[in-house]
Every structure is written in C-alpha cells, then in structure tokens.
C-alpha cells in the first residue's frame, strides 16, 4: 500500500518541480494560442531539459507505485507500454481528468493509450524525453517549454490518482494545504474549488454508494 509518508514525499517533489517551472515564467511567457498550445512552447534550454528529465522519471516512479497497488505482482522494471495498459485498464476515465494552469484548463492525458500498432500515444513528451536520455545534444530542442508543461500536468494527474490509494478513493486532503504553485485541480478543496469534484473514475462508485 502507498503510505502517507511515501505519497507526501512524492507530492513535495512534484511541487518542487512546479516551482522550478514557474520560475521560468519570469523569462518565457506562458500565453497559449487558440489551439491551447503555448505560444513559446518550442523554447528550449538546459533548465527545461533538467525539468523534463526529472518530471518524466517521477511520472514513471509514481505510475509504477500505482501499478503495484493494482497488481502486487507487477514488475517494477516494466516499460511504458505495460504501465499504460495497466493504468488505462484500471482507470479508463483517467484521460478525462482536468488540470488547470493560470492560462487554461485542459486534460493532459486525454489521448493516452496504446495504439493498434502497439505504440503509446497521447504523451509525446515521454518519447521526447527518451530521445534526450539516449542522445541529449542532438535532441536538445525537444527539451521544450511545452514538453515540460505537458509532463508536469500529466504527473499531477498521477499524483491525484496515487493519493486515492492512501485514502480509499479520495485525494489526500493535505494536498489542499500544500498546493502546487502553478497547477491546480477541481478535485481538491481550496479557494478556487470550494466544493471539490470526484476524480472521473470514482464518480460512478459514489453514485453506487448513494443508491445503496
């Protein structure tokens, strides 16, 4: 089981990554165009490279923790295909999870799935991080503002879902008292969201409880 202390360590690390990202906003404007993409999304740097690599590693770390909760025999050396299959089978509505930033509300994992060809779609930043990991300099342009934004918001979704294993279906309340500095969520209680919503995969469970 994911312990509270383990979850809190994950959450604090995520918040630290968000703080680093938010610091970059002082130098790179985070406005979006009419398609929802960051206008300066192609901007790249060593700092973005570090944030992307750290965020991707943490996404994998938290996702593995969730997979081991779903299946205690899950191999923690599994690749992204196995992670994707396990998560999306257990939580088919995870892609509906909405995350908010100062410039928009969106669903970062909306298209996350395994394609008919066996490739992973919907998290392009993951493939870019892999390219950087194996050959950083030729792929440094993939260490972009947009990839960091997408990776961090995707990690936020996984943090929310991981917290439900600590509290039996409810996001940990302490998230609200230790909020992320850049992203927010309608599934948490705070001044912006005074009445938090249920995570997409837990809405039906609550309806069933009410019927009982």
Name the predicted role of every residue range.
Residues 1-53, 210:
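Charged alpha-helical initiation segments
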Residues 59-127, 133-138:
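Short non-catalytic regulatory patches outside canonical folded cores
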Residues 162-212:
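Polyanionic, low-complexity intrinsically disordered segments
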Residues 45-70, 149-159:
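Short, hydrophobic, well-ordered secondary-structure elements
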Residues 17-27, 54, 58-61, 125-128, ...:
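Amphipathic, well-ordered alpha-helical segments in soluble domains
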Residues 28-31, 35, 94, 136-139, ...:
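Short secondary-structure junctions and interdomain/linker hinges
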Residues 132-163:
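Charge-enriched, short contiguous segments at helix-coil
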């Amino acid at each position: 089981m994911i312990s509270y202390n383990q979850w809190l360590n994950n959450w604090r690390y995520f918040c630290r990554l968000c703080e680093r990202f938010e610091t970059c906003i002082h130098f790179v404007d985070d406005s979006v165009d009419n398609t929802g993409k960051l206008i300066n999304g192609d901007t790249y740097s060593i700092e973005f490279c570090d944030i992307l690599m750290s965020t991707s590693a943490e996404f994998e770390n938290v996702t593995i923790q969730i997979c081991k909760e779903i299946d205690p025999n899950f191999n923690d050396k599994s690749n992204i295909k196995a992670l994707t299959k396990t998560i999306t089978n257990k939580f088919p509505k995870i892609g509906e999870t909405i995350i908010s930033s100062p410039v928009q509300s969106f669903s970062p994992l909306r298209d996350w799935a395994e394609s008919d060809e066996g490739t992973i779609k919907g998290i392009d930043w993951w493939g870019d991080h892999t390219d950087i990991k194996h050959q950083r300099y030729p792929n440094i342009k993939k260490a972009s503002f947009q990839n960091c934004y997408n990776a961090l918001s995707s990690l936020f979704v996984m943090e929310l879902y991981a917290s439900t294993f600590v509290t039996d279906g409810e996001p940990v309340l302490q998230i609200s008292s230790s909020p992320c500095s850049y992203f927010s969520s309608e599934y948490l209680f705070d001044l912006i969201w005074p009445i938090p919503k249920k995570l997409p995969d837990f809405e039906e469970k609550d309806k069933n409880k009410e019927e009982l």
